[in-house]
Amino acid sequence: MSNLWVKGEAKEYMPGVHYWENSIEVPNGIIEHMNKEVDDWKINITQDMAEENEIYKQGIFHNGPIRFNPEFNFKTEESITYFKQIVLNTMDKVAQYCELYPDAKLEINWMEPWQYITYTPPKNMTYHSDNHSVRNQQTGKHDLGPYLRRFTVLTYLNDDYKGGALKYRYFDLPPFKPKAGTVLIQPSNYMWSHATTPLLNGRKAAFLVAVSSHYDVSSEEYGATPEDIIRRELR
């Protein structure tokens, strides 16, 4: 697969939130191919697995959001190769974002695990910040990872659906629906609390990764190896 992404030029949606339109090509059929991998993964989730791990719990709901780890769970060459393009494009946009906000570069050291997120109607997300944490089902303590996030990077793969637009709680702006192939970066804290409008049809798909100030403690709590955690360091 040839290079599918371009550097592009950042546009500002609001202070702190920037996006790059047409930053990566979405080949015909790739979303359907990746979605099939997600669906094949879902059917093997048991109730016991869901009770032990929040990721599996989300996976058993029909309409999602399904948070699928593409690094470990993509099995086909097509999906793996395209995901590598997503990673390269994301790192380029992170570098550009840090040029816009030089202090951000001083605060980021690690990346969380990637997520490939899909969901279908009538799903919507209520207002939340990306620093919001929930309790670990196994320990009863709040997961620490979300508290360490500095900004979140989303790659929107499709726009052939109604609804599903971003809305920010504290900014008087209309809902924003990024076009397919758009990368968006937003700060993680409460000032950028956001929701999505209800998804009315179709199946929304995006890649997401959080960029953090400290090592990936959430993965450590869920049993990740030191080698897996160390490789997420930003050098």
Give the predicted meaning of each segment.
Residues 1-183, 191-235:
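Fe(II)/2-oxoglutarate oxygenase catalytic core
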